[in-house]
A protein has these predicted regions:
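Alpha/beta-hydrolase-fold serine-hydrolase catalytic core, especially in secreted/extracellular enzymes
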Residues: 579-580, 588, 596-685, 690-696, ...
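C-terminal beta-strand-rich structural cap/linker in extracellular carbohydrate-active enzymes
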Residues: 565-597
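Cap/lid segment of the alpha/beta-hydrolase catalytic domain
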Residues: 321, 703-779, 785, 819-828
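N-terminal accessory beta-strand-rich subdomains and adjacent acidic, glycine-rich linkers
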Residues: 22-234, 562
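Mobile cap/lid helix-loop segments that gate and shape the active-site cleft of serine hydrolases
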Residues: 815-869, 890-898, 906-911
Length: 963
């Protein structure tokens, strides 16, 4: 039977090139053929849809294989991969993918001359919304055709009958890739025929010449196929932005829902900034009327307050092409190109992170061109964009990834406007994941536990579930601060950790309007959310066999909450009327290694020929440490790539062990390691100070150039200490006297590496000490080599960081006050005054070519930054200690770097292995007692394996920077 199946499948695949008159998907399940001048689409031999287009010409010739392979910064899936077969049918270009079709008509005099229409027979179950220029409405289920004007997307269920069917095939109709000179379209129905009609309020294309239509898109398959499809972005133009490193999805506190005029009140804005700071939300949205702020305050004051709290502000604008008279402002600041450039440049200088632009007026060509102008200008000034009162997504989120969300939805704002939303919200919420949200990000503004002008009757767990079910790169949390801060600690932590960009999305169960259960993965953590769209109790099906067992937390319906930690993943979950749940499954921290047995995991990475500096792109934001990484299995290779970049451009190559002969012995309590290369020998000596408590083998803390942490932290702990004497490898004191390279012990072994920076050589030296500990073993050294820590302060803090980053046998790295060139991001230091920056550091430590190539504004060509140096430590533990009293240390830049680096640990569900503590009021390298608890927590957990109740992952004595 299996062989017959394989034979049939092979025949279907062959038919893609051999069967005349029929277009076939790569997997053979989807076909398109011409009958009576109409294109008939079938899925697994079942007719799904008919459409007419262009001249109805026959499908001829061999197809061309089309591949879409790209990465999204936000969306339902990070890495998108799709293949299709492209056919030419006269003026029609037809693509048949495994999950749908896309077609466009070329050589049109204007878009009004397109002749595309779909046939939707009576009896077909359909979820379809009447068109409005803001795309705010419900998707009621119907089976009868009705003349009118309808909005995208349209969801259909076949076979053509009015009953639900387990074998049903679904089709979702929409469009993609609106470019300049085009308008968006909608559907006009006359009986069973739904014509594609561009917005009739404009010329809709060139009056003369030849134009092509946008892609007409039909996603086809099971409900899961429809929900999980990326076809809308697959056919869109690729990203046009050279530098996307500054684009950061995230959660947002939002003033408007509870206070419609709150953005003209500085004190109310402060409440929402404080909420964002408390919950660690990266953004706050200051909405309409900020240009009318009273009390002697201005938007500059509000932005400054947000930045001082470490919160990035977004601000609102009226597009001034839709609702103008009587509408809120600011108005008329973006319409003209020169005004737009001036306004967005002002936003960038002030520290605004993005803009929400509202009140457009439909899908006309002028509006589409205006939207593209706004996106391109915003990108030039590093501004995120949220379109409101505007069209629905049509692929721009791939082409212009600074467009992180779009309204185009009947969302929670309508609790302010109409009483009917209260009774219809639950069913509507259970419809949106199958309709509107399929095609792109949706700014519904979810998670309202309290009431606005009109009450909500959904449960708290239902509201929490919407934050996962509704995909949006900027997820605006609409409720008032006191509502969120009165929730259980578990709920507040959930909101603090909530991702807004997903690696993977799966539909688990559901049916439009009745219920939906969806699972989204971020790194190694799964977020499973479900809601009941009905007014009756309902048990939702949760078959989660694809999720590995892990630490689970379930937020379910209660009064108002039931929060539990299930030992096994539930197969069903009972929900109250209009109820819901969220299940968070984190891979057990023990499932990811705390430390490795080897210096560098061998993943087969081979360094390429690195580009010349002049050929490197300019990146103002911090590069993406997780570029090309979908899950933890890919992280080792990415670590190798980052490490190779840092060595090539920054510190020089750390020699591999291949050509070295290493031997070790104990001389009393002193470890002696001899390293011989080509007849030259370098000797390392370090005395092991054993603890007075506990039994061997002991964990060990290695101090770079000494132990800077207070002695009392180790007195009562079974931890040995030893010192890496860096002068045995590269004598910094001699460099400070003579400023000569190539005159150090290391250079006798490796004379061809005399241009290396000292941090490469010191990292090599500490690794050889660890070699000695491993070679002799715990029976001789009394040291447990699975629990090695490294620490240092100031220049030795940098040394500790490089040593920990470049040797994966180090379980815990504590870098104390490392300053510029350590954890601080070079790019951020460049924007600060009187700090240790790339051109103002000690070049004994780095390659001289780094200063020559990347000083000044050339720092923006650096292909990495030091948040990635920090990230090399992941999945092992890292603690950064700062002191803001010493400006030279550039702790503002370190804080920016730390926050960006922690995203790597967070992606893999182990964010508690990385933290920072920046506290003043003490001397340089003199750890105050107020920081003992953080340091002790890390030592106890990662060197001693103890459970700790206290953990502060992100404490800083100032918040005066913008990431």
């Amino acid at each position: 039977m299996k062989s017959n199946y394989v034979f049939v499948l092979l025949m279907l695949l062959v038919s893609a090139t051999a069967l005349a008159g029929r277009a076939v998907s790569p997997d053979g399940r989807l076909t398109v053929e011409v009958k009576n001048g109409r294109y008939v689409v079938s899925y697994q031999r079942q007719q799904v849809l008919e459409f007419s287009a262009a001249d109805g010409e026959a499908i001829k010739g061999k197809p061309q294989r089309i591949t879409a392979d790209y990465t999204m910064l936000a969306g339902k899936r990070r890495h998108c991969l799709n293949e299709g077969n492209e056919y030419r049918c006269g003026r029609l270009v037809l693509r048949v993918y495994n999950d749908g079709i896309a077609f466009r008509t070329k050589s049109l005099p204007s878009l009004k001359d397109e002749q595309t229409a779909y046939r939707i027979p009576d009896g077909t179950r359909r979820w379809i919304m009447p068109w409005t220029d803001s795309y705010e409405g419900f998707f009621p289920l119907s089976t009868a055709s009705k003349d009118g004007r309808w909005a995208y997307p349209v969801l259909l269920e076949t076979p053509m009958n009015s009953a639900k069917n387990a074998e049903s095939v679904f089709a979702l109709i929409t469009e993609s890739n609106i470019t300049r000179g085009q308008s968006a379209s909608c559907l006009y129905s006359e009986g069973e025929h739904y014509r594609v009609v561009p917005d009739e309020l404009s010329d809709n294309g060139a009056a003369s010449g030849q134009v092509a239509s946008p892609w007409r898109v039909v996603i086809i398959g099971s409900l899961a196929d429809v929900v999980q499809s990326t076809l809308v972005t697959d056919v869109a133009e690729p990203c046009k932005l050279e530098d996307t490193s500054w684009i950061r999805p995230g959660t947002v506190s939002w003033v408007y829902w509870a206070y419609n005029h709150g953005s003209n009140d500085y004190d109310i804005i402060k409440k929402y900034v404080d909420l964002a700071a408390t919950l660690n939300l990266p953004y706050v949205l200051i909405d309409a009327e900020w240009d009318e702020m009273g009390g002697g305050k201005s938007i500059e004051d509000a932005v400054a307050y947000a930045k001082a709290k470490g919160v990035r502000p977004l601000i609102w604008y009226n597009s001034s092409v839709g609702w103008v008279n009587g509408a809120p402002g600011p108005k008329y600041r973006l319409n003209k190109a020169e005004d737009r450039e001036r306004e967005f440049a002002w936003c960038e200088r002030m520290g605004v992170a993005g803009v929400k632009i509202d009140f457009f007026s439909g899908d006309t060509q002028l509006n589409m061109d205006y939207c593209i102008d706004l996106l391109e200008c915003a990108a030039r000034h590093h501004l995120l964009v949220n379109f409101h009162g505007a069209t629905v997504p049509r692929g721009w989120q791939r082409t212009y990834p600074n467009l992180l969300t779009t309204e185009g939805v009947y969302g929670a704002e309508w609790y302010n406007n109409v009483p009917t939303f209260t009774s219809r919200a639950a069913r509507h919420n259970a419809t949106l994941p199958f309709t509107r949200n399929v095609i792109g990000p949706m700014d519904y503004t979810p998670c309202t536990f309290s009431d606005s002008q009109h009450p909500h009757i959904t449960t708290h767990a239902h509201e929490l579930a919407l934050t996962v079910l509704f995909e949006s790169g900027l997820q605006h949390l609409a409720d008032r601060p006191e509502s969120y801060l009165s929730q259980p600690d578990e709920v507040q932590r959930f909101l603090s950790d909530l991702p807004t960009a997903w690696d993977e999305t799966r539909l688990v169960s559901g049916y439009p309007g009745e219920s939906v259960v969806m699972a989204r993965r971020y790194g190694t953590t799964w977020y499973v959310a479900g809601i009941n769209g009905s007014d009756q109790m309902q048990t939702l099906q949760t078959p989660l066999d694809f999720i590995p067992q892990g630490d689970a937390m379930l937020f379910a319906d209660g009064t108002p909450w039931t929060i539990t930690h299930p030992q096994a993943l539930p197969r069903t979950i009972a929900c109250q009327p209009r109820g819901g749940f969220v299940l968070v499954v984190r891979q057990s921290p023990d499932a990811l290694p705390f430390v490795y047995d080897v210096e560098r995991t061998d993943d087969g990475f081979v360094a390429p020929e690195w580009p010349a500096v002049a050929d490197l792109p300019i990146r103002f934001g911090l590069p993406d440490a997780l570029e090309g990484v979908d899950d933890f299995s890919q992280w080792a290779r990415r670590r190798s790539e980052i490490a190779a970049q840092i060595q090539h451009y920054g510190i020089g190559m750390k020699p591999s062990v291949g050509k070295e002969q290493v031997s070790a012995r104990m001389d009393g309590d002193t470890l002696v390691v001899d390293v011989t290369v080509d007849g030259e020998t370098l000797t390392l000596r370090s005395t092991i100070n054993y603890p007075k408590v506990g039994q061997p083998p002991y964990a060990v803390m290695i101090g770079t150039s000494g132990i800077s942490l207070p002695k009392q932290l180790f007195d009562d702990r079974p931890i040995a200490t030893m010192v890496f004497h860096e002068a045995q490898v590269n004598d910094y004191s001699q460099w400070r006297k003579h400023h000569e390279r190539g005159e150090h012990p290391f250079d006798r072994l490796y004379p061809d590496l005399k241009d290396n920076g000292a941090y490469s050589e010191w990292a090599w030296g500490l690794s050889r000490l660890i070699d000695g500990l491993q070679m002799l073993g715990p029976e001789i050294t009394k040291i447990d080599t699975h629990h090695i820590g490294v620490t240092g302060c100031s220049y030795a803090g940098k040394m500790a960081l490089f040593c920990g980053a470049f040797d994966e046998r180090v379980a815990l790295t504590i870098a104390q006050e490392p300053g510029g060139g350590g954890a601080a991001a070079w790019r951020v230091s460049h924007t600060l005054s009187e700090v240790e920056s790339l051109e103002r550091t000690d070049y004994h430590w780095f390659k001289e070519s780094q200063r020559e190539q990347f000083s000044g504004d050339s720092v923006y060509r650096l292909p990495y930054d030091h948040h990635e140096l920090c990230a090399l430590v992941c999945p092992r533990a890292l603690l950064l200690l700062g002191n803001p009293d010493f400006k030279w240390l550039a702790d503002e830049a370190m804080l920016a770097s730390a926050q960006a680096a922690r995203e790597v640990w967070h992606r893999f569900g182990i964010a508690d292995r990385m933290g920072w503590s920046i506290v003043g009021g003490h001397g340089h390298c003199q750890l105050p007692e107020s920081q003992y608890r953080e340091v002790e927590a890390f030592i106890d957990r990662f060197l001693l394996g103890r459970e700790t109740d206290f953990f502060t992952p992100s404490r800083d004595g100032f918040r005066r920077f913008e990431r």
